[in-house]
Amino acid sequence: MSEVLFREAVTRGNTRMKIATIETFDLTCPLNRPFGWSQGWIDQRGTTLVKITTDNGLAGWGEGAESSIINHLLGPLLIGANPMDRAGLWEHMFHALYNGNNAVGLAGSALSALDIALWDLAGKAANLPICTLLGGKIRDKVAVYATGLYYTEGEFPDRLLDEARSYVEQGFTGMKTKVGGLSIEEDVARVKALRDAIGPDVSLMIDANEGYNATTAIRIGKKLQDLDLVWFEEPVNAQDLEAYLEVKAALPMAIAGGENLRTRYEFKPYLARRAYDIVQPDIMHCGGLTEMARICALANACGIQVNPHVWGSPVMIAATLHLTATLPPCPPARNAQPYLQEPVMEFDRTPSAIRDEVCAVPFDQVDSFAKVPQGAGLGIEIDEEAVRRMS
């Protein structure tokens, strides 16, 4: 979209509005069947939503994982400001965290939540979808893969393999499972059974959630290398750059990571040294739409594909779809394909009332593609009754 058209759009609306209130909602929902991965076991899901309301009644929604930093540090910085000044407000919030290197961890997630809400507000003020504000779409729908196949009690083999087959029946062309929560022998048997169940034509990925050191990651990777795995995600500690380089040099499948990094400054050495084949920034942790767009540009310049990490409510799903719709193929290709040049987005299928009930119309996929929302801002309708019920 041209700058002239954007200015015309916002001039028709609410360019002089000010931020009046900021509310946070810490959401939780129980799980009927607990599940786990290499780092934990949960019996409930949770996230934090933020609602920014202006003096003219317009509201924008964001998502992160921390309410106290929003309520007591970053939120007060925004009261009275014009939400259209997104870049300046991002820098203002980042500067408040900069001196102590506090833009990592939960503070980075708080910054992300507020930034997403500001983009939602800007889109609603201009009556334009966020992807248009970002420069316009390259694609109307985004390729997605099913995330599920976690560890559950008594899952193997029947329940696990039935779950995998159900994703194929739903039209998914790819899916991801966990490793690192069992012995190497047990995890290898689990992944081999999954490959046999879904056949050779469905993309299969594994995710260790930082569960190994480099030596062990290489060991299990070599045991699985004949299964045509598309990628091995977070094989080692997210902060161990040298371990990533060691694993990447030793294994034939692509190495993926980045969901636990914050801001372009943490991503920079991993991208510059090509520690990843695939980078997976998380929009509700890495700095929101503003910062994730910068990270994606860095990755593309380094020839590293961006396949975003997504595990939250419809707010982060919508935000990620809008940004992913604008990402160029990596590298450019006449007939770009998912997994090869086109970005592929995570599509969480684990149980979550938050994901399924917070939005009036939950997101779905058809033939392993999810449509980019067309409405103003995030393009979704939040069910505030459901939000308040779960908070």
What are these regions (language model features)?
Residues 14-59, 351-356:
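Structured beta-strand/loop patches that form or line metal/cofactor-binding pockets in enzymes
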Residues 19, 57, 74, 114, ...:
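Conserved, mostly hydrophobic/aromatic
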Residues 52-125:
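Metal- or metallocofactor-binding catalytic centers and their adjacent structured scaffolds
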Residues 373-391:
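Extended hydrophobic packing segments that form well-structured cores
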